[in-house]
C-alpha cells in the first residue's frame, strides 16, 4: 500500500472530490492531490482534520494500525 493510499480510499468511499475535501480542510485541491500522491508530507493539522472528518484515528491514516476507530480521549 502506498504511503497515503488510505486517504484516497477514505475520500472515494465518502464520495468526496479532492476539491470538496480541500475546502473542508481549508487547503487547495492541488495541495490535497499532492498528499494523495505521496509527493508532499501531510501536516499534523491536516492529518488531524482528516481523522476528524473520517472519524478514524491518526495511526490508521499513517498505516500504524488497521484499527479505524478513534482512540478514546484521555482526561
Where are these regions (language model features)?
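Short, charged recognition helix plus adjacent turn
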Residues: 62-75
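Short, conserved catalytic or interaction motifs in soluble domains
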Residues: 37
Amino acid at each position: 500500500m502506498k504511503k497515503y493510499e488510505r486517504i484516497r480510499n477514505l475520500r472515494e468511499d465518502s464520495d468526496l472530490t479532492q476539491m470538496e475535501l480541500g475546502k473542508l480542510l481549508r487547503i487547495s485541491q492541488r495541495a490535497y492531490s499532492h498528499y494523495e500522491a505521496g509527493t508532499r508530507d501531510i501536516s499534523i493539522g491536516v492529518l488531524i482534520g482528516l481523522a476528524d472528518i473520517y472519524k478514524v484515528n491518526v495511526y490508521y491514516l499513517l498505516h500504524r494500525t488497521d484499527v479505524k476507530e478513534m482512540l478514546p480521549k484521555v482526561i
